[in-house]
Every structure is written in structure tokens, then in C-alpha cells.
Amino acid sequence: DSEFPCPRKQQPAGNSECSYYCEMNGQWKLGKFQNGARCDYNAVKDGVCNEGLCYASGDSASNTQNQGGSRRQENEDQGDDEWDRK
């Protein structure tokens, strides 16, 4: 998957995101957590991850109203534990 070149992995405990960044060959790339993981859509853990994006519970992946709030930008303040290096 060219949009998500990092390996798919399990969502860490306490994490409510659907995607993460990893370092590949000196560049930061996007990866996704497993489908079905709980995520924050509008509130705490009220959504479900599908292919790296967070959808409202009960919505399908084809829903065009996805807020896309699960993708963090690289420059957002987050601890080193959120990043994986390859």
C-alpha cells in the first residue's frame, strides 16, 4: 500500500489513533493499526478504525463524512514512543 508503507500493527493500549508514523530509509512514513480497533471519532473511543481512518461506530468505510481525525501530522507534539524506527 503506497499510502501506508509502514507495516500494519496492533494499536497500543491507551492509543485512540488509527495510524502511526515509522521511519523508513531516513524518511517518516505512515502506517495503520489493525481494522476494528477503537478510536476517537467525536468523543472517547466512539469510533472504529478501518484502513487507517477513524469512522463513527456503525458507519462503513465508504462513508464520505469521515472526519479523518485519526492521522497525526509529523510536526504535532507527541512523545518518542509514538514513533517507530526501521
Curated annotation (Swiss-Prot):
Residues 76-86 have a biased composition (Acidic residues). One of its GO terms (cellular component) is extracellular region. Residues 58-86 are annotated as: Disordered. Its main location: secreted. It comes from the Eukaryota. One of its GO terms (molecular function) is toxin activity. Salivary gland (at protein level). The keyword Disulfide bond applies. The keyword Disulfide bond applies. It is found in: Secreted. Disulfide bonds join 6-22, 18-49, 39-54. InterPro entries: Ixonnexin-like (IPR011694). This is BaSO(4)-adsorbing protein 1. It comes from Ornithodoros savignyi.
